[in-house]
A protein has these predicted regions:
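Mixed-charge (acidic/basic) macromolecular-recognition segments
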Residues: 1-9
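Catalytic core segments in nucleotide and nucleic-acid processing enzymes
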Residues: 9, 13-238
Length: 238
């Protein structure tokens, strides 16, 4: 409880100021088609010198989501990071699951569910190769294990490739199989991609998770084609 309180105080005093979160996300947004344009030094100076930039992105995403969730939930358990004495990130704890696993109890705004948050920094060429399979696998196996089809995934990145959007949307109808047992499969996988530009809108517009959940659900149920879908269902509604 003491560590949680200490973390909350750090968050309240430093990170929940919109300007700080926004500024850090802004530095990540520079990583677009050429990954080298990323402002690593600026990012580290604002957060910590003790972690690599992808780990910092994960940490920032966790804090942003904790803020949007109105500081409900065991965020220190949900983030798969080892933290230093100041509760700043050091390393990612490797494992076969999503970067952040956020548990939500049922409320009037949404059913009980788990949200898998995947944080990826990539350039336009390697994102698809790096991330398509692990994201689908993490969510697919989670759904098969838990049986709760209300659970879903948010894929956060600095640059969204159109074919990444297309592949994630196709998971709405394409079954995912347990590779060890073909009798177990799930269809209707909900994967919502978010670019840092939209993460910044969550911060600047003070969006809460109870507002985001129905927005994501409506986006999932949309029949728009991928090249129209992100702009209409995500970007314009933030």
């Amino acid at each position: 409880a003491d560590v949680v309180q200490q973390f909350d105080e750090i968050i309240i005093n430093q990170w929940l100021q919109k300007i700080i979160l926004y500024a850090i996300l802004d530095s990540f947004s520079g990583i677009s088609k050429i990954v080298e344009t990323r402002n690593d030094d600026e990012i580290r100076s604002m957060v910590t010198d003790n972690a690599d930039v992808p780990t910092i992105f994960e940490y920032v995403l966790g804090i942003l989501w904790y803020k949007a969730s109105e500081r409900h939930g065991k965020i220190l358990d949900y983030m798969k990071l080892s933290l230093d004495a100041d509760l700043l990130p050091k390393t990612h704890a490797a494992g076969g699951e999503a970067d952040i696993v956020y548990e939500y109890e049922a409320t009037e705004y949404y059913p009980e569910h788990t949200l898998l948050l995947e944080a990826t920094l990539a350039d336009s060429t390697n994102q698809r190769r790096m991330e398509m399979e692990p994201v689908s696998r993490h969510l697919g196996m989670h759904l098969i294990r838990s049986g709760n089809m209300n659970s879903y995934c948010v894929f956060a990145t600095n640059y969204l490739n159109i074919n990444v959007i297309s592949d994630f949307r196709s998971r709405k109808t394409t079954p995912f199989y347990d590779p060890q047992d073909y009798s177990k499969s799930v269809a209707g996988m909900k994967i919502i991609p978010l670019q840092t530009s939209e993460l910044k809108k969550i911060v600047s517009n003070g969006k809460t998770y109870k507002e985001l959940y129905p927005l994501f659900e409506a986006a999932f149920n949309s029949t728009l084609l991928p090249h129209e879908w992100y702009e209409s269902c995500i970007n314009e509604r933030m």
